[in-house]
């Protein structure tokens, strides 16, 4: 891969996105997110050699929201291994990210770790044996370690905004608790969940944190193994099939990469063996995924030939 080509493609895509009028709708159900500039756009791509191609608002922190679920899943698998799958499934949901319908049919077991119910169950596992502050600190330190940046922090205003308005998540958690899926007090688990979703990162930081998924579980800069190659492959598989909720099929069809979105407008995508990619555009589509983020990634994979399904 030519770094010059990548730099040019990333700059071109940022310029093209700046001209687009179809930006989607900024999330409004979390009041603090509704204040974000809808015209913001950032893109950062980190290659195997550590070269970073960045453009637009790539260094502006934003609320990563559900993208944090990739990292809590990684932590939980490190703690519990395959025992985690007794609490949560691995199938696409086909429903909205905050739907309670399938929990009713499947006795409180969430379909996958990336819908809200699944991520709450994963958070509960991380919390077990810890105080909420300790569990949250572990998650934040893990993110800082992966990104190599201790300045990454939680946006308390966003966390409090979610706590004040997160009634659907409270319903999901209480419903799972009634089936014995959650071990800890619901308010503790939700507190940790709301706070890790409120971690703020830039595209550059997020792309750095995701590098291990692009390189068989290893950080290529340090040579340190974060997870085994098998576990990295399986996390990527879940990102491909479940990472964009009921828009996951469309994302796979158009972009062809494992990816995880968040309602803050971010997407973390993985080009295995090639690059870790983070894009941010706050306007969302009907499924709650970044509209221009997906468009930008589709352009990137086409021009670079990065789709996992072929050129």
Curated annotation (Swiss-Prot):
Cited InterPro entries: Beta-lactam/transpept-like (IPR012338), Glutaminase (IPR015868)
Keyword line: Hydrolase
A GO molecular-function annotation: glutaminase activity
Reaction it catalyzes: L-glutamine + H2O = L-glutamate + NH4(+)
Enzyme Commission designation: 3.5.1.2
List of residues binding substrate: 66, 116, 162, 169, 193, 245, 263
Record GO biological process: glutamate biosynthetic process; glutamine catabolic process
Database matches in Pfam families: Glutaminase
PANTHER family: GLUTAMINASE
Description of how the protein assembles with itself and partners: Homotetramer.
Family: Belongs to the glutaminase family.
Name the record gives this protein: Glutaminase
Native source species: Rhodopseudomonas palustris (strain TIE-1)
């Amino acid at each position: 891969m030519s770094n010059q080509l990548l730099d040019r493609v990333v700059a071109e895509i940022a310029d093209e996105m700046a001209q687009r009028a179809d930006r989607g709708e900024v999330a409004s159900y979390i009041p603090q997110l509704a204040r974000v500039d809808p015209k913001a756009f950032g893109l950062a791509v980190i290659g195997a050699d550590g070269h970073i191609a960045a453009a637009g608002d790539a260094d502006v922190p934003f609320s990563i929201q559900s993208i944090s679920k990739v990292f809590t899943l990684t932590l939980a698998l490190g703690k519990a291994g395959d025992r985690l799958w007794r609490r949560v499934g691995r199938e696409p949901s086909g429903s909205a990210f905050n739907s309670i319908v399938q929990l009713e049919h499947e006795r409180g077991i969430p379909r996958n770790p990336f819908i809200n119910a699944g991520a709450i169950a994963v958070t509960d596992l991380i919390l077990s044996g810890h105080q909420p502050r300790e569990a949250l600190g572990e998650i934040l330190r893990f993110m800082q370690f992966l990104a190599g940046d201790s300045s990454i922090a939680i946006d308390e205003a966003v966390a409090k905004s979610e706590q004040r308005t997160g009634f659907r998540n409270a319903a999901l958690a209480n419903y799972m608790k009634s089936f014995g899926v959650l071990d800890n007090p619901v308010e503790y688990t939700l507190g940790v969940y709301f706070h890790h979703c409120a971690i703020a990162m830039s595209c550059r930081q997020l792309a750095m944190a995701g590098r291990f998924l692009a390189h068989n579980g290893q950080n290529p800069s340090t040579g340190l193994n974060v997870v085994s190659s098998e576990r990295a492959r399986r996390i990527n598989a879940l990102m491909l099939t479940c990472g964009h909720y009921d828009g996951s099929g469309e994302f796979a069809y158009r972009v062809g990469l494992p990816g995880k979105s968040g309602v803050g407008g971010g997407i973390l995508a993985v080009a295995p063996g090639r690059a870790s990619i983070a894009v941010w555009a706050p306007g969302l589509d009907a499924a709650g995924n970044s509209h221009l983020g997906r468009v930008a990634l589709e352009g990137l994979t086409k021009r670079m030939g990065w789709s996992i399904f072929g050129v």
